[in-house]
UniProtKB/Swiss-Prot annotation:
It comes from the Bacteria. This is 3-isopropylmalate dehydratase large subunit. GO terms for molecular function: 3-isopropylmalate dehydratase activity; 4 iron, 4 sulfur cluster binding; metal ion binding. The gene is leuC. It is an enzyme of class 4 (lyase).
Length: 467
């Protein structure tokens, strides 16, 4: 019998019941909750007069609607304020731990989970948010769920799911200078497309993946959803264990030793068979920039905007034509000639300490270009912000003309005060460049933190390797 993939090991460890058609009731170890997808779920509990099955397995934090500027006056927008106040009230009523807006541990849910040791290897992790796949970086099975499923997990600590197919994305070799996990993610999506991972759980492996920090692995797994995958994951190794050790919610003493012994088994067996294998050469990956309105519309910084006539199908050709029209770009324009109005460094993809260090290294001693109206850096959590300030990164950004903000989802999505105006063009370290994602009529280009910082200082895209 062939060995098991990491996905199969994680899945099998959480099976409660299997229906004849394969639909499986899975046990959920960790439930992350935020203010946008939880109000209806809590309301459902109240109407049914149910209590959460395991309030200790849930943790809540407001992130989507919180202001990233001065918080002393609270939240100005009444709808956003109501959502956060509702989360506060629901968590208090049902006994769920919440890192409120005035708590230094508050931040983006997919940053605070790993940071606090709430995300551990071998866990099933869910959240009412697409980018829950981030937590798979720890050798966990993590995926986003809908609001009705949020209620189901609160009530039963279980969830009905169908098993995914398995894909191995193998990146061998060594990344070049200035090339990051974000570039790997965009290169993978450019290769397989935004539907390439549909129906799959993607495991990232190979020498280049093993060489990544946990921050890099989180970036990669965060973007797995943009390839259409249900989940992304990386096998546990010493890098994983070293990151988790000593975190507030991590096990200690004998429990730690027992956990580590199991965690070390969380990798695909040598003879495991995947449904699909995709291979990339790390040395061939260059800094990536998206040019269109889907993460698969991506090219290298040294290339030009493609011509729709080169699209692989008529459907794609029409998509490219529409994208270029929306983005206000002409085919053949060098990527390096694309000028910018705003730059956003943040989001659950790229707002961790390593991301901020990479951006600060580029910004140091430079100034934001005059044509860039706003360049902002939004740390992923209060603790990331605290650490960055202890390292002097905030001064580097402020001296260069960047705004240094409070933690939150910010300009990743047009759900708070940070957004693009119609026609504004932004270099963003977030994960989605859909039409209107950062604001109605806003034009988003996805890049790494270092590329975003370089673009802010140059006023247009530049190859960070030569900057």
């Amino acid at each position: 019998m062939a060995g098991q993939t990491l996905f199969q090991k994680l899945w099998d460890a959480h099976v409660v019941h299997v229906e004849p058609d394969g639909t499986t009731l899975l046990y959920i170890d960790r439930h992350l909750v935020h203010e946008v997808t939880s109000p209806q779920a809590f309301e459902g509990l109240k109407l049914a007069q149910r209590l959460p099955r395991r309030p200790d397995a849930a943790i809540a934090v407001p992130d989507h609607n919180v202001p990233t500027t001065d918080r002393s006056q609270g939240i100005a927008d009444p709808v956003s304020r109501l959502q956060v106040e509702t989360l506060d009230a629901n968590c208090a009523e049902f006994g769920i731990t919440e890192f409120r807006m005035d708590d230094v541990r508050q931040g983006i849910v997919h940053v605070i989970g790993p940071e606090e040791g709430l995300t551990l290897p071998g866990m099933t992790v869910v959240c009412g948010d697409s980018h829950t796949s981030t937590h798979g970086a720890f050798g966990a099975l993590a995926f986003g769920i809908g609001t009705s499923e949020v209620e189901h997990v609160l009530a039963t600590q279980c969830l009905w799911q169908k098993p995914s197919k398995t894909m191995l994305v193998k990146v061998e070799g060594e990344l070049g200078k200035g090339v990051t996990a974000k570039d790997i993610a965009l290169a993978v999506i450019g290769r397989i497309g935004t539907a390439g991972g549909t129906g799959y759980a993607i495991e990232f492996g190979g020498a280049a993946i093993r060489a990544l920090s946990m921050e890099g692995r989180m970036t990669l797994c965060n973007m797995a959803i943009e390839a259409g995958a249900r989940a992304g994951m990386v096998a546990v190794d010493q890098t994983t264990i070293d990151y988790v050790e000593g975190r507030p919610y991590a096990p200690t003493g004998e429990a730690w030793d027992t956990a580590v012994a199991w965690w070390k088994t969380l990798h695909s067996d040598a003879d495991a068979v995947f449904d699909r294998v995709v291979e990339l050469d790390a040395a061939a990956i260059e800094p990536q920039v998206t040019w269109g309105t889907s993460p698969e519309m991506v090219t290298t910084v040294g290339a030009s905007v493609p011509d729709p006539s080169a699209a692989p199908s008529e459907v794609k050709r029409q998509d490219w034509v529409r994208a270029l029209e929306y983005m206000g770009l002409a085919a053949g324009t060098p990527v390096s000639a694309i000028a910018l109005d705003k730059v956003f460094i943040g989001s659950c993809t790229n707002s961790r300490i390593e991301d901020l260090r990479e951006a600060a290294a580029v910004a140091k001693g430079r100034r934001v270009a005059p044509n860039v109206k706003l360049a902002m850096v939004v740390p992923g959590s209060g603790l990331v912000k605290q650490q960055a300030e202890a390292e002097g990164l905030d001064r580097i950004f402020i001296d260069a003309g960047f705004e240094w903000r409070e933690p939150g989802c910010s300009m990743c999505l047009a759900m708070n005060a940070d957004r693009l105006e119609p026609g504004e063009r932004c270099a963003s370290t977030s994960n989605r460049n859909f039409e209107g994602r950062q604001g109605q009529g806003g034009r988003t280009h996805l890049v790494s933190p270092a590329m975003a910082a370089a673009a802010a200082c140059a006023g247009h895209f530049v190859d960070v390797r030569n900057f």
